[in-house]
UniProtKB/Swiss-Prot annotation:
Region (Interaction with DAB1) location: 632-649
Protein name: Amyloid beta precursor like protein 1
Effect of H433A: Reduced affinity for heparin. Reduces homodimerization
Binding residues annotated for Cu(2+) 1, in chain numbering: H174
Keyword annotations from UniProtKB, A to Z: Apoptosis, Cell adhesion, Cell membrane, Copper, Cytoplasm, Disulfide bond, Endocytosis, Glycoprotein, Heparin-binding, Membrane, Metal-binding, Neurodegeneration, Signal, Transmembrane, Transmembrane helix, Zinc
Residues annotated to bind Zn(2+) 1: E206, C209, C210
Annotated function: May play a role in postsynaptic function. The C-terminal gamma-secretase processed fragment, ALID1, activates transcription activation through APBB1 (Fe65) binding. Couples to JIP signal transduction through C-terminal binding. May interact with cellular G-protein signaling pathways. Can regulate neurite outgrowth through binding to components of the extracellular matrix such as heparin and collagen I.
Transmembrane residue ranges: 581-603
Name of the gene encoding the protein in the UniProt record: APLP1
Result of changing R429A: Strongly reduced affinity for heparin. Strongly reduced homodimerization
Region (GFLD subdomain): 50-146
Organism in which the protein naturally occurs: Homo sapiens (Human)
Lineage summary: Eukaryota, Metazoa, Chordata, Craniata, Vertebrata
Main location: membrane
Length: 650
C-alpha cells in the first residue's frame, strides 16, 4: 500500500482535529444553505431603480428583504424575520434598523412593482411553490423632504394639485395624478409628492402629462386647447364661429373673451367693390408658438390674428402663474421642514409670510388678466367698427352703380348685416359677462345696452330704406332680404332671456316694462322707425328722403353718447347730421326723460311715509302743538321712529 498524501498525513497527525466523518455533514449543510440564500438575493435591480438606493420589501409570510447598497441586490433579513410591511411607521422603523448609518427620516412607496425571482421564503428544499412575485418596495429616504425634480418633455404639461385638508399616501396621490391625466386624454409620464404630512403621507402631488404615442402635437401646447387650431390660408372659419355661438356663455371671469370678426362666408365669386374691404377681412394663418405670448400680444399687435394671439397670451399667462406658484410652494415646503424645531409663533409668522407672497402673486396675475381682457375687447371693437364701415361703403357703392346689379347688392347687404350682427353679439356678450360677474352694474347699464341695440336696428332700417330709391330692385330682392333679416336678426328682444348668474329681477331682460316684443326688422317702404314713432310728421319728397338716408347711412349719423359705451361702438364718427336725425334723437330723449320722471314718481310713492312736500303747508288749527311740531319736522325730511305711534293714533 503506497504512502499517504501530505494532506491526509497532516489531518491524521494534527492533535485535536475533528475526524473527517464529522466534517462531511457540515459541508453538505453549507452547500444546501447557499442556494437557498442565493435564491433570495436573486432579484436584480429594476430598470427604474438605482443600484445603491436603500429599499425594503416584504410579503406576509415570507422573508423580509432589503437592498444591498454596494451590489444593489436584494438580501434577506439577517435575523430571518417575516414582517408584513404595510404600516408606514413600521416600515420606517425597519429601514432605520437595516440602514443605521443613513439616518433614515422618511419612507415612500415606489410607484411601480418589480419582479422578485425565486423568492422561496427561506425554504430549504430545492423547489418553490410560487417562485415569482411582484412586489412594490418602499424607499428609505434620508434627510429632509425634497420634492423630486420632474422632466417635462416637449409637448407635455406640468401640473400639480394641493389639498391642505387631506393627508393621503403616495400611492393615492399617484392614482390622483393618473386620473387627472386620463380625464384630459393624456397619460402620466411622472409624478412627485409635495407637502409631506407624516410618514408616507402628503398633501399634494406634481405630475407630468403627455399625449399618447402617435398623437401629433407640433406646437407643444396642451391637447384640446383652442389655440392649437390652425386654419389653412383661404379657408372659411364661419363654422367655427357658429359652433362657438352654440356653446353656453362662460361663467368665470378668466374665461371671458370677445369673439373677433372672422372671414366671411362668400359663396359668390363677385369681387369686392372696394380694396378696403379686402384689407378688413382677416386671414388666419398658422404661426409658430411665441416664446412669451403675453409680451408678444401687448408689445407687437398685429403679428398674428387677434383671436389666436389672445388665446395664446391667456394660456401663457396661466402657465407663468402655475410656475410661480409651484416655486413658492416648494420654497414653503422646504422652509416648513427646516422650521420644525422653531417656536409656534415663528412658524406661524413663516406661514403668514408665504401666504402673503401667494396673495400678492394672485393679485398681480389678476391685474394682468384684467388688462389682457380689456385690451382684447378694445381691439375687437375697433375691428368690428372697421368691418362695419367697409361693409357699408360696399353696400352704398353697389347701390350707386349704373345700373345696380341685384347679385352684388344682395352680397353687399349680407356683409353689412353680418357686421351689424357682430356688434349686437358683442354688446350682448358684454352685458351677459357683466351680469354674471356684477349683477348690480348690469342693472345700471340695462337701459344703455337696450338703447344701443335700438340704435343699431334704426341704423339697419335706414340703410334698408335706401333700396326704395330703386323700386324695381327693391321688389326683386324683397323675398331674399326678408329671409336674410329673419336669419340675421338679433335685437333688443334677444335680451328677454335671463343672463347667466343674474338675479330673479333680471329675468325680464333689458326690455322696459311698458314695451312690447320687438318684431323682426322688415324692409321699409319709404319710412323708418323714427317716421313710425312720429306719425304726425309730414312725409318728405323722395329727393330729400334719399339725401337724409345717405347722410345717415354713411358713417356720419346718430352721435349717441354713453358713459359705458363709447361713441365709436354705437355709430361711425362723422361730421354731418341732418335736422331729421336731430329731431328723432330729441324725441327719443324726451321719451327717455319722461320714463325717468315717471320712475322717480313711482319710487317716491313707494316710501312708507309718503312724499315730503317742501312748499307752503297749511297748518290745521285743530292739531295740538306736539302734532304741529311733528308735521314741521316731517316736512323738512326728519323721520324719527319715536313719533310713529302719533301717526297711528286715531
Amino acid at each position: 500500500m503506497g504512502p499517504a498524501s501530505p494532506a491526509a498525513r497532516g489531518l491524521s497527525r494534527r492533535p485535536g482535529q475533528p475526524p473527517l466523518p464529522l466534517l462531511l455533514p457540515l459541508l453538505l449543510l453549507l452547500l444546501r444553505a447557499q442556494p437557498a440564500i442565493g435564491s433570495l438575493a436573486g432579484g436584480s435591480p429594476g430598470a427604474a431603480e438605482a443600484p445603491g438606493s436603500a429599499q425594503v420589501a416584504g410579503l406576509c409570510g415570507r422573508l423580509t428583504l432589503h437592498r444591498d447598497l454596494r451590489t444593489g441586490r436584494w438580501e434577506p433579513d439577517p435575523q430571518r424575520s417575516r414582517r408584513c410591511l404595510r404600516d408606514p411607521q413600521r416600515v420606517l422603523e425597519y429601514c432605520r434598523q437595516m440602514y443605521p448609518e443613513l439616518q433614515i427620516a422618511r419612507v415612500e412607496q415606489a410607484t411601480q412593482a418589480i419582479p422578485m425571482e425565486r423568492w422561496c421564503g427561506g425554504s430549504r428544499s430545492g423547489s418553490c411553490a410560487h417562485p415569482h412575485h411582484q412586489v412594490v418596495p418602499f424607499r428609505c429616504l434620508p434627510g429632509e423632504f425634497v420634492s423630486e425634480a420632474l422632466l417635462v418633455p416637449e409637448g407635455c404639461r406640468f401640473l400639480h394639485q394641493e389639498r391642505m385638508d387631506q393627508c393621503e399616501s403616495s400611492t393615492r396621490r399617484h392614482q390622483e395624478a393618473q386620473e387627472a391625466c386620463s380625464s384630459q386624454g393624456l397619460i402620466l409620464h411622472g409624478s412627485g409628492m409635495l407637502l409631506p404630512c407624516g410618514s408616507d403621507r402628503f398633501r399634494g402631488v406634481e405630475y407630468v402629462c403627455c399625449p399618447p404615442p402617435g398623437t401629433p402635437d407640433p406646437s407643444g401646447t396642451a391637447v384640446g386647447d383652442p389655440s392649437t387650431r390652425s386654419w389653412p390660408p383661404g379657408s372659411r372659419v364661419e363654422g367655427a364661429e357658429d359652433e362657438e355661438e352654440e356653446e353656453s356663455f362662460p361663467q368665470p371671469v378668466d374665461d371671458y373673451f370677445v369673439e373677433p370678426p372672422q372671414a366671411e362666408e362668400e359663396e359668390e365669386t363677385v369681387p369686392p367693390p372696394s380694396s378696403h374691404t379686402l384689407a378688413v377681412v382677416g386671414k388666419v394663418t398658422p404661426t409658430p408658438r411665441p416664446t412669451d405670448g403675453v409680451d408678444i400680444y401687448f408689445g407687437m399687435p398685429g403679428e398674428i390674428s387677434e383671436h389666436e394671439g389672445f388665446l395664446r397670451a391667456k394660456m401663457d399667462l396661466e402657465e407663468r402663474r402655475m410656475r410661480q406658484i409651484n416655486e413658492v410652494m416648494r420654497e414653503w415646503a422646504m422652509a416648513d421642514n427646516q422650521s420644525k424645531n422653531l417656536p409656534k409663533a415663528d412658524r406661524q409668522a413663516l406661514n403668514e409670510h408665504f401666504q402673503s407672497i401667494l396673495q400678492t402673486l394672485e393679485e398681480q396675475v389678476s391685474g394682468e388678466r384684467q388688462r389682457l381682457v380689456e385690451t382684447h375687447a378694445t381691439r375687437v371693437i375697433a375691428l368690428i367698427n372697421d368691418q362695419r364701415r367697409a361693409a357699408l361703403e360696399g353696400f352704398l357703392a353697389a347701390l350707386q352703380a349704373d345700373p345696380p346689379q341685384a347679385e352684388r347688392v344682395l352680397l353687399a347687404l349680407r356683409r353689412y348685416l353680418r357686421a351689424e350682427q357682430k356688434e349686437q353679439r358683442h354688446t350682448l356678450r358684454h352685458y351677459q359677462h357683466v351680469a354674471a360677474v356684477d349683477p348690480e352694474k348690469a342693472q345700471q347699464m340695462r337701459f344703455q345696452v337696450h338703447t344701443h341695440l335700438q340704435v343699431i336696428e334704426e341704423r339697419v332700417n335706414q340703410s334698408l330704406g335706401l333700396l326704395d330709391q330703386n323700386p324695381h330692385l327693391a321688389q326683386e330682392l324683397r323675398p331674399q332680404i326678408q329671409e336674410l333679416l329673419h336669419s340675421e336678426h338679433l335685437g333688443p328682444s334677444e335680451l328677454e332671456a335671463p343672463a347667466p348668474g343674474g338675479s330673479s329681477e333680471d329675468k325680464g331682460g333689458l326690455q322696459p316694462p311698458d314695451s312690447k316684443d320687438d318684431t323682426p326688422m322688415t324692409l321699409p317702404k319709404g319710412s323708418t322707425e323714427q317716421d313710425a314713432a312720429s306719425p304726425e310728421k309730414e312725409k318728405m319728397n323722395p329727393l330729400e328722403q334719399y339725401e337724409r338716408k345717405v347722410n345717415a347711412s354713411v358713417p356720419r349719423g346718430f352721435p349717441f353718447h354713453s358713459s359705458e359705451i363709447q361713441r365709436d361702438e354705437l355709430a361711425p364718427a362723422g361730421t354731418g347730421v341732418s335736422r331729421e336725425a336731430v329731431s328723432g334723437l330729441l324725441i327719443m330723449g324726451a321719451g327717455g326723460g319722461s320714463l325717468i320722471v315717471l320712475s322717480m314718481l313711482l319710487l317716491r310713492r313707494k316710501k312708507p311715509y309718503g312724499a315730503i312736500s317742501h312748499g307752503v303747508v297749511e297748518v290745521d288749527p285743530m292739531l295740538t302743538l306736539e302734532e304741529q311740531q311733528l308735521r314741521e319736522l316731517q316736512r323738512h325730511g326728519y323721520e324719527n321712529p319715536t313719533y310713529r305711534f302719533l301717526e297711528e293714533r286715531p
